[in-house]
Amino acid sequence: MSDINTTRLPFVFVASPPCVGDDIAMVLTRGENLC
């Protein structure tokens, strides 16, 4: 899962930086952007 988290982490930040915050953990866990 390390590879998935590493790949997903930058993707989420680039996808929607203003939406990422306290929910980042949830977003990474679900693998979806919950904006």
Swiss-Prot record:
Keywords: Toxin. Processed by the macrocyclase-peptidase enzyme POPB to yield a toxic cyclic octapeptide. POPB first removes 10 residues from the N-terminus. Conformational trapping of the remaining peptide forces the enzyme to release this intermediate rather than proceed to macrocyclization. The enzyme rebinds the remaining peptide in a different conformation and catalyzes macrocyclization of the N-terminal 8 residues. Expressed in basidiocarps. Disulfide bonds: none annotated. GO terms for molecular function: toxin activity. InterPro entries: Amanitin/phalloidin. Residues 1-10, 19-35 form a propeptide. There is a cross-link at residues 11-18 (Cyclopeptide (Phe-Pro)). Probable toxin that belongs to the MSDIN-like toxin family responsible for a large number of food poisoning cases and deaths. Belongs to the MSDIN fungal toxin family. This is MSDIN-like toxin proprotein 6. It comes from Amanita exitialis (Guangzhou destroying angel).
